[in-house]
Amino acid sequence: MFPYPQLNFPPVYPTNPMAYRDPNPPRCRWRPFRPPLAAQIEDLRRSIANLTFKQRSPNPPPGPPPKKKKSAPKPKPTQPKKKKQQAKKTKRKPKPGKRQRMCMKLESDKTFPIMLNGQVNGYACVVGGRLMKPLHVEGKIDNEQLAAVKLKKASMYDLEYGDVPQNMKSDTLQYTSDKPPGFYNWHHGAVQYENGRFTVPRGVGGKGDSGRPILDNRGRVVAIVLGGANEGTRTALSVVTWNQKGVTIKDTPEGSEPWSLVTALCVLSNVTFPCDKPPVCYSLAPERTLDVLEENVDNPNYDTLLENVLKCPSRRPKRSITDDFTLTSPYLGFCPYCRHSAPCFSPIKIENVWDESDDGSIRIQVSAQFGYNQAGTADVTKFRYMSFDHDHDIKEDSMDKIAISTSGPCRRLGHKGYFLLAQCPPGDSVTVSITSGASENSCTVEKKIRRKFVGREEYLFPPVHGKLVKCHVYDHLKETSAGYITMHRPGPHAYKSYLEEASGEVYIKPPSGKNVTYECKCGDYSTGIVSTRTKMNGCTKAKQCIAYKSDQTKWVFNSPDLIRHTDHSVQGKLHIPFRLTPTVCPVPLAHTPTVTKWFKGITLHLTATRPTLLTTRKLGLRADATAEWITGTTSRNFSVGREGLEYVWGNHEPVRVWAQESAPGDPHGWPHEIIIHYYHRHPVYTVIVLCGVALAILVGTASSAACIAKARRDCLTPYALAPNATVPTALAVLCCIRPTNAETFGETLNHLWFNNQPFLWAQLCIPLAALVILFRCFSCCMPFLLVAGVCLGKVDAFEHATTVPNVPGIPYKALVERAGYAPLNLEITVVSSELTPSTNKEYVTCRFHTVIPSPQVKCCGSLECKASSKADYTCRVFGGVYPFMWGGAQCFCDSENTQLSEAYVEFAPDCTIDHAVALKVHTAALKVGLRIVYGNTTAHLDTFVNGVTPGSSRDLKVIAGPISAAFSPFDHKVVIRKGLVYNYDFPEYGAMKPGAFGDIQASSLDATDIVARTDIRLLKPSVKNIHVPYTQAVSGYEMWKNNSGRPLQETAPFGCKIEVEPLRASNCAYGHIPISIDIPDAAFVRSSESPTILEVSCTVADCIYSADFGGSLTLQYKADREGHCPVHSHSTTAVLKEATTHVTAVGSITLHFSTSSPQANFIVSLCGKKTTCNAECKPPADHIIGEPHKVDQEFQAAVSKTSWNWLLALFGGASSLIVVGLIVLVCSSMLINTRR
């Protein structure tokens, strides 16, 4: 496939005539020099030609095209020239895009729209004699014959299909399973197919394109589009394709949405309308617009409705000066500290402060509004606030008058609506102030702003150059959404400025052009609405009346300092700007540590100009993880074993090191050198052996001395040498023993014939019975052997079974020997491994946000709580609040007033980034990536290690597992937070505990099934001002974050790398994997076609036992022909670096090997001919290296031959002393007894 230009469909109206275009445009090539005057004349001629022939006619007005005037007939002589030109054009090659246009015509003829409510909801196409329609697309096919076809549902593929009528079967599209990477044809342009996925540029295609086919250049259907998912700059398509067998396959990228054009409907007074076309707009009917938004606040398309009610239709387009915060109004709120002194009602009350960003920036919500002028239109240089003076009008001022501070001044980064974004120094409080002339309004709240840093090194300021790590910061764009804040219509609030007391009379004085509602109790209760200065009859004191105005065209924030309007519930919501978004942040890199290597250990010399974290873990079964923050210059010692050690210094990458069996002394030297060497390598065993040798020598010496002393004592005793000696008793006893000999076979049969004939015949039947049983076994097995012999000739693969260590990167080498064939070298390497457990998502938890709605206050009456589905919803009614007039609610009654206080919790706005997922972990499945080299062929494959599931690569078939040891770094319960995994025994779903992990739970972040228990307790309000006091437990999520310990990424054993999405442990080095391989016959070479080695001998030139290939050997050989031979080490003591080599008739080859033993005696084969190599290896010079050992150390090779000789000599000497003593003792005893 190849790219092609996007198609242009014929316009509704004729386009302007194209300008003249030279078919052979001038190019930058060498031309002969022309005089300047000739060049100027030529340029002038070209300019006149451009003005004459390249003029475009003006755009035609909308409507039917104007009639063309009849042009005069052109002279006849010009016609032949036109024909000539036309003939020349026909001789040219077809212009590019012709096949694409043909495909598009096929697509338009064989694709039929699906209509729903008069709109195209999707498409159906006829492919291979069948009608195919996406299952999620509702409506009727716009074709009478196809609309009558009965369709069958295939929900697995999101399709409906049926046979097309007989008269249409010959006129359908054909499908194909051939999809080479490249570009394909679609209705909206080119579709790229790469890595098994169809993608288009983002913004191409969308709702209503479901069911459109993707065609190749021959007009065959490659796929049918069902939907798509945005992935950055491109959109991945969800499609239905076919495989080589014609079976349907559905390929759905993660996060894809179906592309059916379903019109989103909203409701207004039981009448539905499209959400993108509301019947009202805010500029024309503000109160009605708020009614529409409140009625559809829970509609999934609320954001679409909110966006469109701000756009009023007009005859000409103009820049919009309204946005979502135009619907709102600033307000006065109760601030605990005004100007760092007493509490007050402040025009810039701080409602919330968020400090979840990793770069130290904070997001503040206040009662003023930023980016708007006094009228409420957008103006980035202004802000507006509610004045506390007189009539509480809304005023505006310059954004330069806004100041934010903590322990020092803050830098403002952005603003929108009620929200500010600022960069602040650390502090214990946050202050926002308005400086206007000599007056200043400020509000201070207690909030600890900590110094933030990312990574493993603390820093005050991010570096200019460093390492980039993942972090989360507040997005400076105002259009991003971090969630919603709830809004409501403001309730009535009385102002004293609306009352005037003069000469014992009371007047209602509304602002100019405003209506004011009054309530008076001057004997009788009276109420009304006035717009001009009005006298209240019978009233003598201003405190007998209250006057207020209620604006139902604006929303205010759902603040606990405001009374909720009695006619409206809390239903509005607006977006919170400055979303917390993932990005990368620069972090510093500490000085690289200096490493000193010693025997089985390292010393890290560290220099840190700032607090830097050092973590370590062992790569064996016991991780023994450590963590330490280091400042200044220091050194740390760590022991390193054969299993390895991993350390991470600051923001540097992890470093893994392994110990070599290096030690002073010489395992092949003198006894003192041998003792020094083995004492450093194996101190305990060396001490035990030395103690045993010393004890043997001591026992031998003592025994020999005792025997000699006893013999001397016996010989020198006078009475023991008496005359008339007799024969010793021991010799006399030997004379009493009768000589015996066994009877022959003939004598035995003769004895049985004359004495016991039945037993004779029984003895003769035993061999006969054995022969009968053997022949019967052969007769039973003969059919199986015959079948096996027949099938043996038909087998096309040779099965080889072996066991491979599950250590990524360490190859396992074997030699496959098959009768009649030359040996085949086999190398198996575990390239990667993934231990993926099956998980069950229990719930999602994060920091909760407590919502305190504006209270409901009823003067001279009572209220009742109602049930609610909100999480941890608490409601209480308090009586006797805000007594007669001087209370915050300004009620006329004394003790009959009531307040309904509510509280509930929800997920914090930044939970989309900072949250934890609680998972239950079950059985894990191990999947390994293998690299198998047999002969000259290399194969890569992935297979599950379960002993059942086969893996294949071309002609190679592999069955792996089950693994020798069951292991998983995950406990039964794990918690995932920001990509880090913790083993944590979290509470079950629904078993919430206040102040503990899981105090707020939900199935997902956007779910509505939130449950919580945070111990909210509502308190009775004081009488001074409207408020909702409460107490609550601390966030359990924040407590867990501060005490969660270290993640599994730093503490997992066996060097596992823990990853998420999905949860898995990668490259864990543990256990052994049994593997059965079916090697194809083509890989083997018959013995008659390969060289035969006649003689071979091995000489070891040099040997250093280490993790590297420190040994070198030479094979002297004689062969019958020239060719290639496999070489292999048949012992686990050593492994060869080379797998094959070239041999001649007579010659030698040099090979390299790796061993971990001082005495490496191993068998090497060349083309199947074996020989033994004896290597006395020296210890390596490097104590610590950066790669693991390739072979393990064995006991028989751990002790050198020289050491065995010295050890046996010592034991032999000790035993010789004992033997000498015993000989002396026996000789003396015999002498004494003889003389007696």
Curated annotation (Swiss-Prot):
Q: Where are the annotated segments for Host transcription inhibition?
A: 37-70
Residue ranges that the Swiss-Prot or TrEMBL entry lists as coiled coil: none
The UniProt annotation puts the region (Functions as an uncleaved signal peptide for the precursor of protein E3/E2) at 260-271
Annotated region Binding to the viral RNA: the residues are 83-111
Catalytic activity, per the record? Autocatalytic release of the core protein from the N-terminus of the togavirus structural polyprotein by hydrolysis of a -Trp-|-Ser- bond
Modification note: Structural polyprotein: Specific enzymatic cleavages in vivo yield mature proteins. Capsid protein is auto-cleaved during polyprotein translation, unmasking a signal peptide at the N-terminus of the precursor of E3/E2. The remaining polyprotein is then targeted to the host endoplasmic reticulum, where host signal peptidase cleaves it into pE2, 6K and E1 proteins. pE2 is further processed to mature E3 and E2 by host furin in trans-Golgi vesicle.
Q: Which residues form the active site?
A: H136 (charge relay system), D158 (charge relay system), S210 (charge relay system)
Question: Region annotation Disordered: residue ranges?
Answer: 44-103
| Glycan-bearing residues | N270, N515, N637, N936, N1042, N1067
Q: What is a single cellular component term in the Gene Ontology annotation?
A: membrane
Question: EC number(s) of the enzyme?
Answer: 3.4.21.90
Q: Where is this region: Ribosome-binding?
A: 96-110
Q: Where is motif Supraphysiological nuclear export signal found?
A: 44-51
* UniProt keywords, alphabetically: Capsid protein, Cleavage on pair of basic residues, Disulfide bond, Eukaryotic host gene expression shutoff by virus, Eukaryotic host transcription shutoff by virus, Fusion of virus membrane with host endosomal membrane, Fusion of virus membrane with host membrane, Glycoprotein, Host cell membrane, Host cytoplasm, Host endoplasmic reticulum, Host gene expression shutoff by virus, Host Golgi apparatus, Host membrane, Host nucleus, Host-virus interaction, Hydrolase, Ion channel, Ion transport, Lipoprotein, Membrane, Palmitate, Phosphoprotein, Protease, RNA-binding, Serine protease, T=4 icosahedral capsid protein, Transmembrane, Transmembrane helix, Transport, Viral attachment to host cell, Viral attachment to host entry receptor, Viral ion channel, Viral penetration into host cytoplasm, Virion, Virus entry into host cell
Give GO terms: molecular function aspect only.
RNA binding; serine-type endopeptidase activity; structural molecule activity
User: Extracellular side: which ranges?
Assistant: 260-687, 743-767, 810-1205
User: Which residue numbers mark the site Involved in dimerization of the capsid protein?
Assistant: Y184, N217
Q: Where is the lipid attached (S-palmitoyl cysteine)?
A: C715, C735, C736
- Protein's recorded name: Structural polyprotein
